[in-house]
Amino acid sequence: MGSFTSRPQITSCSGTDDKVEPPEGASPEQFLEWVRRPLADLPGILPREYRRAPAPSLATLHTASAAAGAATFRLLQWNILAQALGTHADNFVKCPPEALHWSTRRFRIMEEILTHSPDIVCLQEVDHYSLFERVLGVQGYEGLFIPKPDSPCIYLPENSGPDGCALFYRTSKFQLVEHHSRILEIWRVQSNQVALLVTLRELQSQRELTVLTTHLKARKGALLTSLRNEQGKDLLQFLEQHRHGRPAIVCGDMNAEPVEPVYATLTQSHQPSLSSAYATVNDGHEPPYSTWKIRGDGETKHNLDYVLYTDEGSSALQVLGALDHPKEEDLGPGRAPSFSCPSDHFSLVCDFALPPLKRPPFHVEEDHRGR
């Protein structure tokens, strides 16, 4: 989404989530039951199938990593649809208005995240960060957030402040080493898009991992295509500035189909070498869509969201599998968002294995004293 800078900013309606009180000390099952309680009279979340990585990747994993006790983790990537945009800008003509109510949507978003039990959560269009920080915090996550410098949300009625990118990690699995944020630049000029980068240490293996999440410029046209590509170049420079040879994941809503230049920029670079997790589990092909919506100007479906990972050398991650996107027949004629799907984008859920640390051989020096 672009900026509505010709309009005056509207004071945010903060405090809309103050009455949400997540239960302390609940097990994951009990907590999920609490999340689902307000949704009891609504259709459930959409069914999805898990797709394992092809046999060669699994064979490589078993021979190279599993024997060394490689650590595995799950990552969830999702543009959750900013509430202000969903209700006052995006014109989802086939979505029941009640399905866009925040009182319903917030619990459906939480349900989607917690059902898949990710170790790392990367979100875009987050305009209720404090709620997710509080709710996910009760379940053992810590998070970070960077807002867009000129979010379109702040020009819309009933907004809750600017939207931006958020990243959460499970503290029983990872420790935060460092974090950085950046306003992406286009030809050395700051844009309205941001990136959030964290380095995490996996507690069991002590292996470090860099994760970067972003949301690139939207809309069609030759100029916008070029702007996205420049943002992609800046993104890679930002990553290499802080990665220091670690395994890395770059994920987000890139607002670009695989045929766009920015996709090639991200996946054909050698600094670092990145592959798409979903293409890996789909025999080299990206899914046909990661968003499917009907607005006032018509129906559109595109593949815009990606999870990219380092695929070479000592920083190579192993993809174990990923969750397929919802099928057309399950989406129904209204597509997304809906009562079952709280966003116009679908979450991407991927399982990875970290490469083991290469430690120097242990040498015992002979003691020649007294000889």
Task: Label the predicted regions.
Residues I80, V126, L216, D253-M254, ...:
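Active-site metal-binding loops of divalent metal-dependent hydrolases
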Residues R106, M110-L123:
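Proline-aspartate-enriched helix->loop->beta-strand connector
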Residues I80-S103, C153-I154, W187-R188, R219-L227:
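Acidic/histidine-rich helix-loop elements
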Residues G2-T60, D119, A222-L223, K233, ...:
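Metal-dependent phosphoester-hydrolase catalytic domains
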Residues L75-L76, V250:
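Residue-level marker for buried hydrophobic side chains located in beta-strands
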Residues F4, D17-T72, I120-K217, Y306, ...:
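Structured beta-strand-rich core segments of catalytic domains in phosphoester-bond hydrolases
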